[in-house]
Structures are given as structure tokens and as C-alpha cells.
Amino acid sequence: MIKQNLVVKIPPMLAGTELLSALEVLPDYDESIRDLDAATRLMALSDLYKLYLPSQMSVEIYSKLYLALLHSLQKKQTSLAIQQQKQNYRAIRQQTYSGIIGGSDSFTIIGASGIGKSTAISRAISLITGNKVIEVEEPYTTIVPCLVVQCPFDSSVKGLLLEILRKVDEYLGSKYYENAMRVRATTDMLIGSVSQVALNHIGLLVVDEIQNVVNSKHGKSLVGALTQLINNSGISVCMVGTPESALFFEQAMQLARRSLGIQYGSMRYDAYFEEFSDVLFSYQFVRNETILTPGIMEWLYEHSAGIISVVVSLVHDAQEIAILSGKECLNLETLNMAYQQRLSLLHGYIEPAITKKPQSTTTKQNAPATKVI
């Protein structure tokens, strides 16, 4: 009965057109804004960064996170969970303890920087949780459905554990972080404490920027701590990072097993890219409207290397330059000015001279989400 009560506390799972519609974000836009003064148009121009068109990646991430949360909730307040609470208390007291409840789920979401991983995850979590904390009456408890933390830059195990406690306090108004700092808890004590907190109050834990473990001597220790947390709490853990983190997890079997998941590259020149470019180009704040041509679309792809955040930056900065310079036109001239003046540090990564459009534009690919990270 308890498991059913927890599951019904989250919104029903969506799919198909209903899911795409729920994920989509189209900022309000009125063409008459092009006749307003420059200051007003420049301020409204930032709405481009709010645009979000769900892609195949968005759908897959939503489904993966929803099912992982569901699996985690189904293990809470069972007889095994109660036994695990006693073991975690022993860990806090620095006594011998063991993991009884077992791991729920551990997976990765890996993709190049700028393809929209974090935004896709944020949109999915917002839809899955409704931005609400789960409350259960008997026995009374509160659960954060999805908790997102960042991997410390130095891969500090203690830093990550304290950050989890701090984020839980933000949602629940508790004092776990304050108490841990007051007693100067050791890492071993913190693992027991965080396991207990996760068992009682966390559904799904998302650890972003996991690539920080790659070049740190504490990297394997941090992944080991996450594994121990999974086994002692039964919650699902999602690790998000760039492709370099995949090389780290491939080093050993125990790491590879914990990093099974989904991977994405830059966007293909396909129907989705064309649709996204068309929608993005409809948000024009310059006085003279420009029609999106196949030539401009190809230019955008070649000068972004299929990285969606770069596409948005190009169109945004080109309009900003056009307004400030008085050119008032979004065309190849202003787009090229934006590329040369604003994106110079990315030239070595984009290389438009050798980035060519694939012959076929009809093959379906796992395209990334559409907004910058």
C-alpha cells in the first residue's frame, strides 16, 4: 500500500505527442516588437534562450529518468528499507554495517558540451515532479523526487556528500548539513548519514559534471562512494557528463557496469535541425525581416558543427550586432560578424571548412535537445 501511495504522488508518465507538447517551450512573440526602440528589442532578444523544442534525446531522457524514479520509489518503506535504516545507523556510529536493500539503478547520460543535456534533464525533471515534494501521511515523511547536484571540481567525496545534504535542506527545511558540520563528521560517518537521508528523502539523485572525476586522483574514490550510496539507500543515481567521462568508466568492469546509459553527439543535418532553425529564425527583433533560405540554414550548421547552443548564440548575437550597428537585418553578413567577433574562441573546434552537410537529410538520429545548457 505504501508503495502505491508513493507512486501515485508523481504525475502519470507521458508519451508521444502529449509528451512533446508538454516539453516544448515557445516564448511569446509579437512581430510588432520590430517597430519598437532598440533598448526594448535588445532586452526581448534574450527570449531566444528560452526556446525549447523537444528532440529524440529529450524523449529518451524523460523516459529514463521517470522509470528510474519509479523503480526507486517502489523500494522505499518496504521491510528491506526498514532493515537498511538500522544498518545505516550503525554506519553513522562507525560500527560494522552492510548493504541490505541493494542498488536500484545507476546509469549515465553522456554527450558533448552544448548539446542541451542539462536543459533536457531540467525540463524532464520539471515535468516528472511538477516541482513538488512528495508528502506521505502514514508514516509522515517527505521525499524529494529528483535531487540534482554537481560533482565537485576536485572530486572530493566529502564535498559531494555535504552538497547532497545541503540540497536536501533547501527542499525540506531540514538541518542535516548544519548538523554534519557541527559534529565535524568524517567521510565514513557522512556515507552512513547521506545513505539514511537518501533512503528516507530522495527518489532520484542526478550528479552533473561527472567528467570532473577523469583528471582527479579522487575520481575512483568518488565513484566508489556513489556505488556504496546506491547499495545502502536503494535510490537511483544518474551521472551526467561529457564524452571524456566515458573513457574513465571504461577502465574497469566495475566502473563500466555502473555507467551503462545513453550517449549523444552533435546534431545531424536532418529534419529536426531544419525545424529548429525555422522556429528560431521566426524570432526576429531587427526591423527588416529575413526569410530563412537553404543557404543560410547550411551556413548555420557548418558554423555550429551541429552544437545547438552555438546555433542559438549565432542567431542571438547576429541580431544584437545588427541592432547596435544600425544594419537592422539578420542575414549572412551579420551572422558572419557574430561568428568572427563573438565566437572566435570556438573556431578551432568548429572548423566550418571541413564540416559538410550529410547527403541524406531523412535518416532519423538521436538529435539533442534544443536549448543551451
PLM features: residue spans?
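C-terminal alpha-helical "lid" subdomain
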Residues: 1-34, 45-48, 52, 199, ...
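The feature captures the helix immediately C-terminal to the Walker
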Residues: 122-126, 312
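Conserved catalytic segments around the Walker B and adjacent sensor/switch elements
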Residues: 133-152
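Walker A/P-loop-proximal flanking segment of P-loop NTPase domains
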Residues: 1-105
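Post-Walker A helix-loop "phosphate-sensing" segment adjacent to the P-loop in P-loop NTPases
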Residues: 127-139, 170-173
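Mid-core helix/loop region of P-loop NTP-binding domains shared across ATPases and GTPases
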Residues: 78-81, 85-92, 98-102, 156-163, ...
